[in-house]
């Protein structure tokens, strides 16, 4: 069956001398693998639509075995991302997480839209950390191991959330903090912001401003949390660990400042 599918290339792999095997995150059938015949040939029409992070409209033959791309049309090349080492590193991280955590052909239009909107944001804005954090939290929820952020993970209390416990799987209130002496201190305001990031559509967020140390704290929490519950080694994270990102001061638009 020939299907018209809009999607984003999240992984590519050489297949034989002239072909590519690509992984596409789509708005119609979720994540799937497809063979792009001749895509490694320099003059192939397939070469342009099988580059990493390309958003394209694919005409794909979906069969019982490996799907095959018949043709494609580039919708958005995200050129700025692909020409910027920092933005490329972040999107590579997002793409690898998505590939590792999503089951094949399990459609989720909302998550796909968040992935696409995050790429648009990164392509057009200087701020890259926070949109990725927002997507990451939603992806954890889809994968079934989201942290408890709206209430205490021990007693359900929604007030006085002051510690994040990797061991307990989320926030702890002041009364339950003793359950994990190694829990990470986090302000109540920042904990509320983290919960907001996990729930809200990126399109509803204006420009975002956060102190660099708070961004780094959230990143530390999510890294340690993923290491405990994620189950897959993420190769691209090593590149992020080696990069010191500039967090700009955003002066215009809606902002969250903590």
Curated annotation (Swiss-Prot):
A GO biological-process term: double-strand break repair
Family of the protein in this entry: Belongs to the RecO family.
Gene designation per UniProt: recO
Protein name from the UniProt record: DNA repair protein RecO
Top-rank taxon: Bacteria
GO CC annotation, single: bacterial nucleoid
Organism: Oceanobacillus iheyensis (strain DSM 14371 / CIP 107618 / JCM 11309 / KCTC 3954 / HTE831)
Gene3D superfamilies, per database record: Nucleic acid-binding proteins (2.40.50.140), Recombination protein O, C-terminal domain (1.20.1440.120)
UniProt keyword list: DNA damage, DNA recombination, DNA repair
């Amino acid at each position: 069956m020939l299907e018209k599918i809009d999607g984003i290339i999240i992984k590519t792999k050489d297949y034989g001398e002239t072909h590519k095997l690509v992984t596409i995150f789509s708005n119609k059938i979720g994540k799937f693998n497809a063979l792009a015949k001749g895509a490694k040939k320099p003059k192939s029409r397939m070469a342009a639509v099988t580059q990493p992070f390309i958003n394209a409209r694919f005409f794909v033959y979906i069969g019982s075995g490996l799907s095959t791309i018949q043709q494609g049309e580039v919708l958005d090349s995200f050129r700025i991302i692909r020409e910027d080492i920092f933005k490329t590193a972040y999107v590579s991280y997002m793409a690898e997480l998505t590939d590792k955590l999503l089951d094949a052909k399990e459609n989720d239009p909302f998550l796909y839209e968040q992935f696409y909107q995050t790429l648009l944001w990164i392509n057009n804005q200087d701020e890259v950390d926070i949109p990725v954090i927002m997507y990451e939290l939603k992806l954890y929820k889809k994968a079934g191991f989201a942290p408890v952020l709206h209430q205490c993970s021990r007693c359900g209390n929604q007030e006085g959330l002051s510690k994040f416990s990797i061991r307990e799987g989320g926030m702890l209130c002041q009364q339950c903090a003793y359950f994990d002496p190694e829990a990470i201190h986090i302000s109540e305001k920042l904990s509320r912001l983290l919960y907001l990031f996990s729930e809200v559509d990126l399109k509803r967020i204006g420009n975002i401003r956060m102190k660099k140390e708070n961004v780094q704290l959230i990143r530390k929490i999510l890294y340690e949390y993923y290491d405990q519950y994620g189950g897959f080694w993420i190769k691209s994270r090593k590149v992020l660990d080696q990069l010191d990102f500039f967090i700009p001061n955003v002066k215009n638009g809606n902002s969250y400042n903590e």
